[in-house]
Swiss-Prot record:
NCBIfam families: 3a0107s01c2 (TIGR00972). Keywords: ATP-binding, Cell inner membrane, Cell membrane, Membrane, Nucleotide-binding, Phosphate transport, Translocase, Transport. Coiled coil: none annotated. Residues 36-277 form the ABC transporter domain. This is Phosphate import ATP-binding protein PstB. SMART domains: AAA. One of its GO terms (cellular component) is plasma membrane. It is a peripheral membrane protein. It comes from the Bacteria. GO terms for biological process: phosphate ion transmembrane transport. Its EC number is 7.3.2.1. It catalyses: phosphate(out) + ATP + H2O = ADP + 2 phosphate(in) + H(+).
Length: 282
């Protein structure tokens, strides 16, 4: 790193996806196919400054992973995309999160409609206290009026996409609580995609799962990117390397480096990124 680079802030020294780097200034430019554009995003828990001037472009139809040590802000950043913070008056976001040119932070659009476009799956499997069938149908009924036959087709479609249909097709009337942890997480993914969102957010989706269930979820993530833009938060760097096309490394609320996953893991631009990936830090 030369002397001029050493005085740039972390975002200005960010590595952007191939073909998107402004060589003159070292700043990331928006990919032509960016699905979400984050501009000068700051986030606060009361007076605590949790995210600091984040600038990031999430490529469409790809899997983007957020990595970094606990408390670095990766889950906070993920949850700003569908305004989960709106539930808590002491939390606020400033800046822009653009999707199709619309700033999601200031839009007057009904928040439930926003979350229909940007689905989310949480760290711990959270099936609803109802049947497997109704877990899938519940969200669909909020946004669409389908006949019973159409709903049956949608339920089968979502469970098939989540690689769960063959395991539950004969017990759709049974409680989702009766499924294994891995099956419950796939049920939650099926529930998320049943309303046909454009973006799917996954917050540590495998942290509570065994290795076999984790492998199935990772295979599913690879398949889902053909239809969705996927953003995943993970503490597991091997998982990020296996599953994602792009990776963002965060530390203390700042975006340190962002780029193609292979380049981030093999030849990162920032020493901080290299130290974290190689286990010398974090």
């Amino acid at each position: 790193m030369n002397m001029a680079e050493s005085h740039l802030n972390p975002v200005e020294r960010t590595a952007a996806p191939a073909g998107t780097q402004d060589a003159a200034h070292g700043r990331p430019l928006a990919p032509l196919n960016a699905k979400i554009e984050v501009n000068n995003l700051n986030f606060f828990y009361n007076k605590f400054h949790a995210l600091k001037n984040i600038n990031l472009r999430i490529p469409e139809g790809k899997v983007t992973a957020f990595i970094g040590p606990s408390g670095c802000g990766k889950s906070t950043l993920l949850r700003t995309f569908n305004k989960m913070f709106a539930l808590y008056p002491e939390q606020r976001a400033e800046g822009e999160i653009l999707m199709d040119g619309e700033n999601l932070l200031t839009t007057k659009r009904d928040i439930s409609l926003l979350r229909a476009r940007i689905g989310m799956v949480f760290q711990k499997p959270t099936p609803f206290p109802m049947s497997i069938y109704d877990n899938i149908a519940f969200g669909v009924k909020m946004f669409e009026k389908l006949t019973r036959s159409e709903m049956d087709d949608r339920v089968e479609w979502a469970l098939t996409k989540a690689a769960l249909w063959n395991e539950v097709k004969d017990k759709l009337g049974q409680s989702g609580y009766g499924l294994s942890g891995g099956q419950q997480q796939r049920l939650c993914i099926a529930r998320g995609i049943a309303i046909r969102p454009e973006v799917l957010l996954l917050d540590e989706p495998c942290s509570a799962l065994d290795p076999i269930s984790t492998g199935r979820i990772e295979e599913l993530i690879a398949e889902l990117k053909s239809d969705y833009t996927v953003v995943i938060v993970t503490h597991n760097m091997q998982q990020a390397a296996r599953c994602s096309d792009y990776t963002a490394y965060m530390y203390l609320g700042e975006l340190i480096e962002f780029g193609e996953t292979e380049k981030i893991f093999i030849k990162p631009v920032r020493k901080e990124t290299e130290d974290y990936i190689t286990g010398r830090f974090g």
